[in-house]
Structures are given as C-alpha cells and as structure tokens.
Amino acid sequence: MPRHCSAAGCCTRDTRETRNRGISFHRLPKKDNPRRGLWLANCQRLDPSGQGLWDPTSEYIYFCSKHFEENCFELVGISGYHRLKEGAVPTIFESFSKLRRTAKTKGHGYPPGLPDVSRLRRCRKRCSERQGPTTPFSPPPRADIICFPVEEASAPATLPASPAVRLDPGLNSPFSDLLGPLGAQADEAGCSTQPSPEQHPSPLEPQPASPSAYMLRLPPPAGAYIQNEHSYQVGSALLWKRRAEAALDALDKTQRQLQACKRREQRLRLRLTKLQQERAREKRAQADARQTLKDHVQDFAMQLSSSMA
C-alpha cells in the first residue's frame, strides 16, 4: 500500500506523479521525541472520540512536504536532494472549521452543469409572483440561479415565438432588460435569414461521395465504455491479447535463433577439435623427424670417428 499524508483534508499519495512534482513524505517522530507533540498539535486532528488530540499508535504515519515551509528543508550533496531538517515542524494546515464547511458544501451542493428541476420550478414561480406594476425594483438574480429551463436557454432564436417570453409593456420584470435585446436580435436574425438555393440544393443534383464511405469501419475497443480512473486499470482485453500473441511470436523466433546458434556452436567446436588434432599430428611428425635426423647425425659421427682411427 503506498504511503499517504495523514493530515486532515489532505489526499496526497506517494505515487510517481507526486514524486515528479517534488513532493516527499516524512514520518511522524516516535513517542520519545518531544517534536511529536508539536506535530500532532499543529495537525489539529482530533481522536475518534472527538475529545482530545489525535495520538496514533501506528509507526507508519506520514506527512507530505506541502505542510512544511521552504526553510524546513536543506540541500544535500550535488544531486539536489532536499532533506528535512532535524528540528522541522509542519505548520501549514487548514483549519478544522474550514474543512467541515468545505465537506458540508460538497455533500449538500448541486453538481455544476446539472440544473435541479424542482429548484428551477420554484425560481420560475417566484419570478412570476414578483411581476406586477407596483413592484418598484427587483434585484437581478444571482449567477448560479437559472430561472429558465435548459431547452429555452439553449435555443435563443425561438424565444420571440414563445408566448411565455412576450411581456406586456406595463409590466416590470427583472429579466425585461435581458429579454429585450435578445428578442430584438432574434427578430433581426430571423428577418435577415432567408433560404438560398446554395444552402438547400435540389435533390436531383448529384452529390459527391463522402470520404467516410472509403474509410475502414473499426469497432470500438473492448471496454471503451469503462472510464479510466486509475493508473492500474486493466485496459483493453483485445490489446492485451495482441500483445501476448506478439510476445509469443517473438519468443518462438528467439528460440529458433537459439537453436541455430547452438548448432553453429557445435559445428565450430567439431571443426576446432579437428584442427587441434591435425596440429598435434603435425607436431608429433616434426618431433619424429628431428629425432630421426639426430640419430642419423650421431651414426654418421661415429662412423667418421671410427674411420679416422
């Protein structure tokens, strides 16, 4: 299991990406070290009962380098390695109330980009109730509140034709200043836009073939609908099958090359043995010839000495 930061609200894990970003992890001092209390006090993390400070029993508690100031590290050697100083204490932590408020907002907030239907209906009802001649002024709506459905907002050209958008001139609405220029622009666009023969060709004219007709239709890869959320995801089974087949083919080819190299080595060994045997025979023949010559010289010397005597 990879190391992770134990600070409240910190989700940093010891991965290749974090190491490339220069984030390091440092273990919590042991219980006999006086700096342990400072680390836990600055962490502001409560125990499971919520009464006192957090005092873990595990020896594998780490804090990432994002909770330390820059002056807490020192440069070691020429490799650029940053080491934590002996008396360093983590001081950069988010307050507990801020973390709770963030978690509450994330838990009860609406996801961005997806409007709530009931919220839109209530907003439209409030907008319709506020419309009237006695209303002096209505503040503009907030940017995060959408008072119109998505269908009407996505097609502004159809707003002038909608009966819900047409308002009486005597009524005041917080959206009248927005709908007026929008409706005028839509009317001008509708009047200026006229069908042309270039935009609507006759069906009798021959159309050129689409390039997509000549393209190869490839099926989607296996598991394409699965979202890749982790770096250790399995991936496409077809791709892994092709890789396995390629690896098996490469293994078969390597084995054939190995067998051929072994046969070549055996032939070279046999040839070397024959050459060594021929060399040994030549050496023995030369030794025999020298011995024979030596014997002949000795016999000739003996005959010569006997004849002179």
Curated annotation (Swiss-Prot):
Main location: nucleus
Physiological role: Chromatin-associated, histone tail-binding protein that represses transcription via recruitment of HDAC3 and nuclear hormone receptor corepressors.
Alphabetized InterPro entries for the sequence: THAP7, THAP_Znf
Location within or outside the cell: Nucleus; Chromosome
Keywords: Chromosome, DNA-binding, Metal-binding, Nucleus, Phosphoprotein, Transcription, Transcription regulation, Zinc, Zinc-finger
Name of this protein: THAP domain-containing protein 7
Phosphoserine PTM positions: S162, S210
Quaternary structure note: Forms homodimers. Interacts with HDAC3 and nuclear hormone receptor corepressors. Interacts via HBM with HCFC1.
Any one GO BP annotation for this protein: negative regulation of transcription by RNA polymerase II
Lineage top rank: taxon: Eukaryota
Comp. bias regions, Pro residues: 198-209
Membrane-traversing stretches: none
UniProt GO MF annotations: C2H2 zinc finger domain binding; DNA binding; general transcription initiation factor binding; histone deacetylase binding; histone H4 reader activity; identical protein binding; transcription corepressor binding; zinc ion binding
GO cellular component terms attached to this protein's record: chromatin; nuclear membrane; nuclear speck
Region entry Disordered, spans: 176-210
Organism whose genome encodes this protein: Mus musculus
Pfam short name (any one): THAP
Sequence motif HCFC1-binding motif (HBM), residues: 229-232
The keyword GTP-binding is assigned to this record: no
Keyword DNA-binding listed: yes
Zinc fingers (THAP-type), renumbered ranges: 1-93
